[in-house]
Every structure is written in C-alpha cells, then in structure tokens.
C-alpha cells in the first residue's frame, strides 16, 4: 500500500518536469486520483496522450484542471476533495524574472498565498511547497520572490492547526534535465554542431536528479513539521565540470564557449544560510529548519533568545561535496533522458 492509498493528490504546475516525475512514480499505485492544475492546455493534452499510451490502465486517474494560481477562484474550483497538494507552479527562469519582476511576484508570492488560502479553506491535510536555493541570500528577482514565498508559507503555517493543514517547504538546487535547465540546451547545441555555451567556468551549482527532487518532497510530506523548510544534502560541481561531463558523453572534445554571467546570477548558491544553520536539525541525508513559533509578544523575544545554536555554518555549493567529471557522468547516466539521448545519437 502506497503513502497515497485511496487519496487525491493535486500538483500545481503539474505539467512540468516535477509533475511528470510524480506521475511516473505514483500513478500506477493505489492512489485514487492525481489532479494536474496548470495554465497550458496544450501541455495538459500532451501529458494526457503520453500517459494514455504509457499507462493505459492507470491514466484515467489523472484529472486535468485549467487555471492559474494567480486566480483564487480557479484554485478553489480545483481544490474540492483534495487530500494533499504539491505546489510546484512558479516562474523560475532567472533572466525573465529580472525583466518582469512583478510577474514573478504575482505567481510566486500571491499565487502561493492563493494556494495556501484555498487549501486551508478546503481542509487539505498537507501542502508541500517547492522553493529554490536562490531564495537564500537572494540577489535576483526570482530568488527574492521565492524568499517571499517562503515567508508566506511560514506565516500561513502559524495561522492554522497542523492537525488541520500541515504546510512545509522544500528548497533545492539545480534539477538535472528538468524543463528549462541547461543540460538539454547543451545537448541541442551539440546536435546542431554549435559550441556549448557556459556562463562562468568556476561557478558552482548544487545538482540533483528529478527522482531526488521527488524524494525530498516525499521526505517533507512524511517527516516535516508545519512551518519547516527542508533541504537535501546535495553535492555540487563547477559549471566547467558539468560541461566537460556532458561533452565527454556526447561529443568528446566539443568546443565549450564562455559567454559570461547572466542577469541575476551568483558564483555559488546557498541551500542553508548561516542564520538557518544555527538551528537546523540534521536528519541524515536532509536538514530540517523549524520555523520560529514565537508570536508578536516582543517582551518574550527579549527574554527567550536563541538558547541553543549549532556549530554548523552556511551550507552552500562551495562547501558541499564537489564532484569531478567522472562522478558527474555517473549521475548523468542514471537519468533516463540522458540514456535515451545517447541511444538516439548512437543510432543516427
């Protein structure tokens, strides 16, 4: 029996890479229904046909709702009878959010508030929200909007009993081969015979697979306390290492062209800030950051400061385990997307 036996799970932004990974893992189980909520009817239609072909007996458990997290009414309309929500809807492209920051605010901040408001009103038992390492010490509009999203999540968690609705947040780094990520772009550049373009060779980034992203959300679902932020102890690599790993698999010696840092990018990313590390709880492969449960009684703040602090300091993509080219290639070869692309290239 699965953890979602006879339950209805709703995924906002569900036609994306994360939603596809959840469907692949849980659709053919004893889950009652997986509800996909998103804006794009074409992507919904593509997903419908894909799973009808891939899992014909289980595909009927997917229900599609067209709507926008910015529109509270459409969110509420999709929420009836939902037990759990994975909130993945977001604007996540750093450059576009730099040029249209208010669009990022509308989706990532107001949209999240709408999802949580509707979930609480509908009696949803648990909401797990997906955030990003760019929310820690943000320097760009996307990261800033996600940082505000996290504040909304923590604030909402204080207003509702966790027995009624548990609200948690997961924060993770780059998900390899997810929609809009760099590896599929590089593979397309290799196919076209063009140099692959990298921003800055020494830039470091956390890397994880889609399966690991789902694992993190499931860990939060099963182990998180309302108001928590949970992160995985992910490894990292330099952009140059990642580029050499990809070209080594697809086209050894292929040209790598440095184009410089884009709008809003940092040299390294942070999964846990120094302040969060002070009270983070080590859970093996994960860290749990509990929210501050104190209220607005400021006298209490002066009396009850941080009485217990960890020695753990900032957890970032420079001080985590840094993988070499061979180690990154091993992670890449574990991905079905990479194996399929390599097979197609071999059969050309």
Model segments located where?
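Strand-loop microenvironment adjacent to phosphate/nucleotide-handling motifs in alpha/beta enzyme folds
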Residues: 3, 151, 155-348
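N-terminal Rossmann NAD(P)H-binding glycine-rich loop of SDR-like oxidoreductase domains
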Residues: 8-29
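Rossmann-fold scaffold of SDR-type NAD(P)-dependent oxidoreductases
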Residues: 12, 79-88, 129
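Conserved glycine-rich Rossmann-like NAD(P)H-binding loop of the short-chain dehydrogenase/reductase
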Residues: 30-43
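Conserved residues in the N-terminal Rossmann fold of short-chain dehydrogenase/reductase
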Residues: 38, 65-66, 106, 200, ...
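Conserved Rossmann-fold cofactor-binding substructure of NAD(P)-dependent oxidoreductases
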Residues: 63-84
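Hydrophobic/aromatic anchor residues within beta-strands of the central parallel beta-sheet
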Residues: 64, 104, 167-170
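Conserved Rossmann-fold NAD(P)-dependent oxidoreductase catalytic core, especially the SDR/UDP-sugar
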Residues: 87, 91-147, 151, 155
């Amino acid at each position: 029996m699965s953890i979602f036996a006879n339950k209805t799970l709703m995924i906002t932004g569900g036609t994306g890479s994360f939603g596809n990974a959840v469907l692949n893992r849980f659709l053919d189980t004893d889950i009652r229904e997986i509800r996909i909520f998103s804006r794009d009817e074409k992507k919904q239609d593509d997903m419908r046909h894909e799973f009808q072909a891939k899992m014909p007996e289980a595909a009927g458990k997917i229900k599609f709702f067209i709507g926008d997290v910015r529109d509270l009414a459409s969110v509420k309309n999709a929420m009836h009878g939902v037990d759990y929500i994975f909130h993945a809807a977001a604007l996540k492209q750093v450059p576009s959010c730099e040029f249209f920051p208010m669009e990022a605010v509308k989706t990532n901040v107001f949209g999240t508030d709408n999802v949580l408001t509707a979930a609480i009103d509908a009696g949803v038992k648990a909401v797990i929200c997906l955030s990003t390492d760019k929310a820690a010490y943000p320097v760009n509009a996307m990261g800033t909007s996600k940082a505000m999203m996290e504040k909304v999540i923590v604030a909402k968690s204080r207003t509702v009993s966790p027995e009624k609705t548990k609200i948690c947040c997961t924060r993770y780094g780059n998900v390899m081969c997810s929609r809009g990520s760099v590896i599929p772009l590089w593979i397309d550049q290799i196919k076209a015979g063009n140099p692959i373009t990298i921003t800055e060779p020494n830039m470091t980034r956390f890397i994880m697979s889609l399966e690991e992203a789902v694992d993190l959300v499931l860990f939060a679902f099963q182990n998180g306390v309302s108001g928590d932020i949970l992160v995985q102890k992910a490894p990292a690599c330099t952009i140059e290492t990642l580029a050499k790993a990809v070209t080594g698999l697809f086209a050894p010696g292929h040209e790598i062209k440095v184009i410089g840092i884009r709008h809003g990018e940092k040299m390294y990313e942070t999964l846990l800030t120094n302040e969060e590390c002070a009270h983070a709880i080590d859970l093996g492969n994960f860290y749990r950051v509990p929210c501050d449960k104190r209220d607005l009684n400021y006298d209490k703040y002066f009396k009850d400061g941080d009485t217990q602090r960890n020695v753990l300091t900032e957890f970032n993509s420079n001080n985590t385990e840094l993988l070499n080219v061979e180690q990154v290639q091993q992670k890449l070869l574990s991905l079905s997307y990479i194996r399929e692309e390599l097979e197609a290239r071999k059969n050309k």
